Amino acid sequence: MSDAPYPVLVVAPLVIHGHEVEAVLFDAGGIFVIPDPHVVSPLLQYYGAVADLDRYHRAHYAGMAAKSAAGSGERDWSEYNRAYVESVGVPSHDCEEAATVLDRTRNAYIWRHPLAESVAALRALHEMQVPIGVVSNATGQIESVLARSGVCQVGDGPGVPVRIVVDSHVVGVAKPDPLIFDYGLAVLAGIDRARVAYVGDSVTMDVHGSRAAGLLPILLDPYDDHDGADFLRIRSLLDLLPPSTPPHR
């Protein structure tokens, strides 16, 4: 985890809900990619789910809210699965079987459907010269998936250039263990970790983990599933940008 050869840039800090931020690290799943609805939808339609792909976007966050409410760890997706299939309209009498099908289908490699709005926000941050990177619980695939999906890559490429993509499988430590964030912070030399935001979609993994690491946790909560929470929430990654920033579509 040696310091990367990046210059210390003097960039006006972002101000997010009153907090000055000099760099931003992100989760990957639920932030830039979600389980591909083109894969999941046909499987769940067999059990009565709707075909509207937008509902599968909402279903992911319903699932994550249920998972967080249960305090489930990284390996327990049972609450996520049930909330997901309910959200896409599977009748109650078929939810158990549909949730089992989802569980056996939702592998690491179908977390590949890019969220265009999030990618646009990431590009805007890059163009503002805000140091950015990714820290994700994954299985060794996330750097390739993000690049192949046109989201981001380290250095030049078709996606947004980022400083680092940390994969928990590769580094051998996973959220909510705060040590994983040290790998991302290693390329942010000269920046106080208290002025580094971490944006994720899980209270248990992302908010608790990054808070323990001394970062500023921010939850992406597009459907306001966590009203009254004691941490910062945004409905879109575009909310990270100054109001005068033009959209990047």
Report each predicted region and the residues it spans.
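N-terminal helical cap/lid subdomain that shapes the substrate entry/recognition surface
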Residues: 3-128, 140, 144
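Asp-based, Mg2+/Mn2+-dependent phosphohydrolase catalytic module
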Residues: 1-26, 93-95, 119, 123, ...
